[in-house]
């Protein structure tokens, strides 16, 4: 009975503190907040298969005083968010992933949507955008390894092309073919930018034209050039690529400044993730005393990201049985910590980073009921 009263007092104290704390903060318009969140970590970094961004939006206008952070949005977590007067829930995992054909009270995910809309609470999910971000989940996971240098295993592409257009077209025009007239005609095509420079080929003065153009404009450019066989025969068409980003991407390949034993690395990981147990598969020929210099890691489910990466150790939340066997056969040890255990601890760092990024304009709180559904007993 006494313990129940203590828990009630503690819960009441937290709620009172939350209300006092939130009253000291101002509000942000939802659209302005979403723009700031995208500035913090662009949604363009997310994988193409993912469902990220604003998933549930109350009718506008909608202002946010309290941003509620959770790894998984369950019904228990939703109840907590409502009790704490959340205006927007940032759920790392998207609670809406597969399309919904109806919104009824039948399934728990449908009920989440209903309760959010009834209580004017938005739901936002960054998921793999935060996996890829330089200050994101995987970088946080790497902090537990010790002093190391790291790089993405699969670098992300920049969200934009460094120049206008998706293609470059180059061809030469002789001075007898009136370069100015050709340039003028090309500039009339929407989505084309033209540069030119002089060149001499086979003792003939020429103007080398270079165009950057969109995919749609490319068809019109080719149609124009094909009208003049001399142009068309000397044409080169290049497909432009978005550059890879140095510090952004999926997974991390971490090289320790100093090698440590596998046993030491296990203890570091358990300490960082606040876990008493992890699952270990020893690589063929390896022991707990084997040195670890290179660690490949991926928060959550890492099979597809880690596969084929040369390392002493794989660290992730979960992998399939056969992928573990495959890694072990190559002498790579594997540590599995359960899916969300490799992600949830990041939220504390995220709260501090968002407080600074948003200039302390709103109240940001962490879920106290969010937890991994699996327990070792």
UniProtKB/Swiss-Prot annotation:
**Annotated family:** Belongs to the GTP cyclohydrolase I type 2/NIF3 family.
**Residue numbers carrying Phosphothreonine:** 255
Q: Where in the cell is it found?
A: Cytoplasm; Nucleus
- Keywords recorded for this protein, A-Z: Acetylation, Cytoplasm, Nucleus, Phosphoprotein
**Which positions bear Phosphoserine?**
259
Q: Where is this region: Mediates interaction with COPS2?
A: 244-377
Q: GO biological process: any one?
A: negative regulation of transcription by RNA polymerase II
Gene Ontology cellular component list: cytoplasm; mitochondrion; nucleus
Give the protein's recorded name.
NIF3-like protein 1
Please name the source species: Bos taurus (Bovine)
Identify the stretch annotated as signal peptide in this record.
none
